[in-house]
């Protein structure tokens, strides 16, 4: 994973996703890493030929919406998060990274079948869509436990200081 996406894993905004809860006590960051690992495992176990680097990068960025979806407001009612966050994640990821068509497909289509008209077109998107559903279920029912959110300020150096403090 590190070889495929060092720019993502070390970016300030990706590190900020440790400060937002996704499901249960799982952060968005942990969830995206889980989905990435499971996506690779699915492709390996089922011998699905795919572009692994794009699979990993798309999985890491599939929930790159960069806000706490549990807090609703007039523009982001929390009960509609599932419908609109793929577009927000794609916009955010596109503004920071040069995405391939496969990576865009993964990010934009990962909520299918909820987003009925956004059918995945490549096998990488189908794999991530499947892995995302499985991870979401296991995280929601607390079969997989997270560590809760981390207070994160805006820089990589600040994040490393927080992690060092927590380890001690």
Region spans (language model):
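Metal-dependent phosphohydrolase cores
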Residues: 1-168
């Amino acid at each position: 994973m590190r070889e495929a996406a060092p720019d993502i894993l070390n970016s300030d905004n990706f590190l900020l996703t440790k400060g937002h809860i996704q499901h249960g006590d799982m952060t968005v960051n942990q969830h995206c890493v889980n989905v990435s690992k499971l996506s690779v495992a699915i492709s390996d176990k089922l011998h699905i030929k795919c572009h692994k680097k794009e699979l990993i990068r798309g999985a890491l960025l599939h929930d790159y919406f960069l806000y706490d979806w549990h807090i609703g407001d007039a523009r982001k009612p929390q009960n509609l998060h599932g419908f609109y966050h793929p577009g927000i994640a794609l916009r955010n990821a596109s503004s920071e990274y040069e995405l391939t068509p496969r990576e865009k497909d993964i990010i934009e289509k990962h909520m299918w079948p909820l987003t009925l008209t956004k059918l995945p077109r490549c096998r990488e998107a189908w794999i991530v869509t499947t892995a995302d559903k499985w991870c979401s279920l296991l995280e929601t029912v607390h079969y997989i436990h997270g560590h809760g959110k981390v207070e994160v300020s805006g820089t990589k150096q600040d994040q490393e200081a927080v992690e060092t403090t927590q380890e001690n």
